[in-house]
Amino acid sequence: MSSSSSSSLPTSSASTTTSSITSRPSASHHLESILSSSSSSPSILSSLTTQSTSSIPTSSSSSSQRQSTSNADRPVSPKPMPTPTTLSEWQLLAVLSKANLVQYYDVFIAQGGDDINQIMACEEREFLEIMNLVGMLPKPLHVRRMQRALAEYSQDQTAFNLAALQQIGPPPPLNYTPAGTDPMALLLPGIAAATSPKFPSLRFLSQLSSVAEKVSTPSEAADTSSSSPSLNLNTTSSNSVPLAFKFSTPLLESLASDQQSSSTSSVRSVLPSTSSNTSHPELPAGILPATTTNVSAAVPPPSSRATANVFSGNSIGLNFSGAASVTRHLVVPPSSTSIQQPSTSFGRSSSITGQEKEGSSSPFLGVGYSQPYGNDFVSLGDFDPNNPSLTENPTLSTAQISRLAECALAASKNLPPLPPRLVQNKKRVSKEVIELLKCSPATPSMIHAFRKYSAIYGRFDTKRKPHKVLTLHETTVNEAAAQLCLLVPSLLTRRDELFPLARQIVKDAGYNYAKSRKRPCDPADLHSPISSPGNSPPPQESEFDEQPSSSSGAFKEEERPPIPPEAWAAIIEKMKGELPES
């Protein structure tokens, strides 16, 4: 029994092993059949391939969207400011930076448009051609911004250049000016003279450039602009512009020491001459030169009430440091030694009377003091302003013209160098005025031409009623403007500054004009309530505009030899025999 069971176990195990062995080829055969069937049906593979390939662009597109979103969120680094290599390129960059059009700088340089004066002197058609060359013409708003920046540059180049220093930094200090020429004198003619000989402006620009290179980013420069000291070469000037970078301590110390030494030397040079009046024979008795610091502290701020196209804050430079080097002539009061407080506005006292009289404080003859001349200007002549003529303009006497000439001479000594302007009120200077700038007023015909083109009221190129005569004050202002233009001919092209100067000279001469004074009764205006004698309108704005010129040639500034002081006495004597233009 046991033998039979034992014999059966090997048989069963052998059969099991045999069956398992035989089952393995069947499984492999089954796998081969599946592969053969899948190869025989390519539609399944194609569908799988299509589905997998269709899912790939979706994932790639989503990843590209995520990448673009991350790039958009990433801050874009600002384009670096172009680096000018010459003075003209720096001036072009200053104008474009003011108009926020720096992207056109490279195009301007490539087209040869680095001369701002050439762009300003061209006519409208030429200007539009230039705008077309640089690609600005299709964008009218950019052209308008460019025009506004050029207009602001033409009004006051010194203030414009000061503002450009804090925006784009100083110009390159080397290889852009002729030999022996001071670069700061070209950019800031009124401020370059404030630096002493030991600290020339060329060295000042070099140190300024080295300090500017330490500023890493524009944002850091903007953050430090509020806390950085300001470039205030004149401590009394209200138009100081803070620079957009920090000064180093040695630079500040050297600048302060140079200012102190220059002011001390100017005081020492002036003090010996204050003991007597023999060194200034051209000045009237009682007028002595005073120190620069007293004048700077006593100059009143410009008035907010502007006249004759003079806007608020656009004074002609009485606060310029360049004018500080010129000796100021002040009137020493005979009995008073205390200095009064200056008036609150230019030409207006702090207490205004009911008649609105203009103040008597003068920045030329008596800052803070009483009038050098009493209110006797009208009594020097034969014309009575209370009984004016209805058909003839007033005529000034020889004594009145001589008084105006003396006040104009004292005023001209306190003015900074004023270069002529090619464009004023968006109009070019006429050829006749340019010819007057080239010659000296030594003949009666030249004096007559100066009176013609310096007139403020009743000009030949304005629309004025032919029957409307001038008042005595208007005639006096015209004569004061002519006397001042004889001494400073460039004021013929700077009429917005000539008008307030002429009015101040009239007040210095002793003519305190009351604004409420009525005009003479005009029969032609009796039926016109707008132009009645009691409500006479101010002069039209067109009366202060310069006559447009028909020529398009560029004006070349020629250096004229200065007229010696002793020659002006003979010219003033000739002026006494001349009558003002009727």
From Swiss-Prot:
GO terms for biological process: exit from mitosis; molting cycle process; negative regulation of DNA-templated transcription; regulation of development, heterochronic; regulation of DNA-templated transcription; regulation of vulval development. GO terms for molecular function: DNA-binding transcription factor binding; transcription coregulator activity. The keyword Transport does not apply. It is found in: Nucleus. Residues 396-519 are annotated as: NCD2. Keywords: Nucleus, Repressor, Transcription, Transcription regulation. Transmembrane segments: none annotated. The keyword DNA-binding does not apply. Residues 1-84, 257-287, 333-365, 516-582 are annotated as: Disordered. It comes from the Eukaryota. Residues 573-582 have a biased composition (Basic and acidic residues). Interacts with transcription factor lin-29 (via C-terminus). Belongs to the NAB family. This is NAB transcription cofactor mab-10.
